[in-house]
Amino acid sequence: MFVLSLAAMAQNKPRHATLSQQKMCADQAKKSFEEDNIKPEHALTWQFSSHYETNTNICYVMTWISTMDNSNKFTLSHYVYDAFEGREYASFIEIGSDVVECSVAPTPEENIKCKTDDDFLRLVYKQYGVAK
């Protein structure tokens, strides 16, 4: 009975990524970010972060790129995608003060709409564990 209790507890305990999984994810995230995101001419921010999710075996990458063009128009974009397969899970685009896209799609059938950068970042952290 004690063994069954330990087994049940182990199933409910979240697994953490090993150092090798984290490194594999970080390396692939860097590679995919640099290959898929040409640095804009007027980039203010051109960065990414990654998170390896052990339950799904997915390496999530979140990019954040901000630019200011010659007319002082500010653009901010974030994307969350799988570093290995390229599937996009979330996107946010703000041009000037207008949010033109803000969606988080945990599954192909589900699409959560959001309204602000803060909403997007909160949802992305909750759904995928990846943060700025």
Where do the model's predicted regions map?
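Low-complexity intrinsically disordered segments
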Residues: 88-132
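Secretory pathway export signals and precursors
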Residues: 21, 55-57, 98, 110
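Secreted/processed peptides and extracellular or luminal domains of membrane proteins
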Residues: 31, 65-67, 108, 120
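Sequence contexts marking disulfide-bonded cysteines in secreted/extracellular proteins
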Residues: 24-28, 58-62, 101-103, 113-115
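Mature extracytoplasmic domains of secretory-pathway proteins
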Residues: 43-93
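Bacterial N-terminal signal peptides
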Residues: 1-5
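N-terminal export/targeting and maturation segments
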Residues: 8-51
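Periodic self-assembly scaffolds
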Residues: 19, 23-26, 86, 95, ...
